């Protein structure tokens, strides 16, 4: 869920959006992460989407890598990533560069997210798989999570991507409730199509943990949120993240509401009652935030976790 805290917007944010900058050892890890990313000519969703958690996550030596280019073929009204109808072809060197960066950072778990590539016949699936395979070949003990596009509904491409690929978590974000999807997401996306991709992933690989994310504060109602939860559970989604939507700038979908931490807690409890194995819920939670910890929580016992960054 990409965000950008502009100077103008930052003065209007509630107090619970304060973020600490890294110091000491955390600052050194932040710099090392910066070097590993830049040194391997990689992109991260942390940077491209202006994530507010970048200092915390990079200060812990973790990052979410974004593959298949810096530009997305879709223009969603919530997202800061640049839109381009025909981006450059995926870099064939990227899979190895990704593996090198994961090795340099000493990661035990890597989250790989993607841009939409509607310009490619398979939606980018072959390149996404090459990236996963390269990391696994170099570092077979590293856990892998893929935050995937909807592949334009191409289930054959999804099968080619998932069959036999070394992966622990398959994630795809519905982003918002069904009613708001046409306002918030690119016209080529739909709530139903996202559900179909999540369902198909579970059918292809029943052992995979599936995950999705919803932004709050776009104008959704409580009933619509509950309906979205139920729809995700109906297709077998097990992990859920909930976070506050923050507009990247003028011209994007407006923020309709700042959701309080207490309401995030209440929604997490509701989600838990519906059967999600683990939930990360809080104003600054993003879909890949502390992903390894969320998976570990789900594998140990059902929990509800509110992950929030405050000063």
Enumerate the language-model features and the residues they cover.
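Hydrophobic residues within beta-strands of alpha/beta enzymes
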Residues: 110-112, 144, 170-172, 240, ...
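Acidic/histidine-rich catalytic cores of soluble enzymes
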Residues: 152, 170-191
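Auxiliary Fe-S-binding modules of radical SAM enzymes
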Residues: 1-64, 68, 80, 96-103, ...
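Short pre-active-site segment immediately N-terminal to redox-active cysteine/selenocysteine motifs
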Residues: 68-75
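Short, ordered loop/turn segments at secondary-structure junctions
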Residues: 84, 115-117, 149, 174-177, ...
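Conserved glycine-rich "GG(E/T)P / GGGxP" loop and the immediately following alpha-helix
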Residues: 110-129, 219-224
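Conserved alpha-helical substructure of the radical SAM core
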Residues: 83-110
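A short acidic, helix-capping loop that chelates divalent metal ions and anchors anionic groups
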Residues: 116-121, 178-184, 248-254
């Amino acid at each position: 869920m990409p965000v950008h805290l502009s100077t103008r917007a930052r003065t209007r944010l509630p107090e619970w959006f304060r973020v600490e900058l890294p110091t000491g050892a955390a600052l050194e890890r932040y710099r090392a992460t910066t070097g590993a990313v830049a040194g391997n000519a990689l992109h991260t969703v942390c940077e491209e989407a202006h994530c507010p958690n970048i200092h915390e996550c990079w200060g812990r030596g973790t990052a979410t890598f974004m593959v298949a280019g810096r530009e997305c073929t879709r223009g969603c009204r919530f997202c800061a990533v640049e839109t381009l109808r025909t981006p450059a072809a995926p870099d064939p060197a990227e899979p190895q560069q990704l593996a090198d960066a994961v090795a340099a950072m000493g990661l035990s778990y890597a989250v790989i997210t993607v841009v939409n590539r509607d310009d490619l016949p398979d939606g980018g699936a072959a390149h996404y798989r090459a990236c996963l395979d390269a990391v696994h070949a170099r570092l077979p003990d590293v856990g892998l999570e893929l935050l995937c596009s909807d592949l334009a509904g191409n289930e054959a491409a999804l099968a080619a991507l998932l069959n036999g690929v070394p992966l622990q978590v398959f994630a795809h974000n519905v982003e918002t409730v069904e009613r708001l999807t046409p306002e918030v997401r690119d016209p080529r996306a739909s709530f139903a199509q996202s559900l179909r991709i999540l369902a198909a992933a579970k059918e292809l690989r029943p052992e995979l943990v599936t995950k999705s994310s919803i932004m709050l504060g776009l104008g959704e109602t409580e009933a619509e949120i509950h309906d979205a939860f139920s729809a995700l559970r109906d297709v077998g989604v097990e992990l859920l993240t909930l976070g506050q939507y923050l507009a990247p700038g003028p011209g994007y979908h407006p923020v309709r509401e700042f959701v309080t931490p207490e309401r995030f807690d209440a929604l997490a409890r509701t989600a838990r009652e519906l059967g999600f194995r683990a939930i990360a819920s809080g104003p600054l939670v993003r879909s890949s935030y502390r992903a390894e910890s969320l998976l570990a929580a789900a594998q140990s016992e059902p929990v509800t976790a509110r992950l929030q960054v405050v000063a």
